[in-house]
Amino acid sequence: MSEMNPLLLLDNGSMMSVLNEGEFRCKNLTFEEAKHILEIHDEADILRCFNSQDIENVIFNYLGVEKRNFTYKHIRNMRVGQDAIVFKLYITPSETQPIIHADDGVEAKKIQNVYVYCQYLTRLA
């Protein structure tokens, strides 16, 4: 792993933790840009700073990134010059609650909508 500045993968909570000190630049990423950034980094040069299976599903199943086992590490401060991809989940109650019936008769109801977007974060100073 690059001892200087591994790429950090953050979620809503871990992003708030690393923003406690310094100057940062943040920009929105398309899913294609996020996938490209992940693919150009070696597995050993990426740290996963969250424990969310939902976000891992976004990375590997939705973005289509090859399954890798990124090392987990709790990070409190980003280093100057360090970059991160932030996966922001936004959950809202469902305005409609359609009911579906499975083949075996089980009933399920939609209760929420889940949205995700990506940001690229760099610590400047």
Task: Describe the residue ranges of each PLM region.
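Intrinsic-disorder-associated interaction segments
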Residues: 23-31, 39, 48, 52, ...
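N-terminal low-complexity, intrinsically disordered segments
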Residues: 2-44
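Polybasic, proline/glycine-rich intrinsically disordered low-complexity segments
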Residues: 77-125
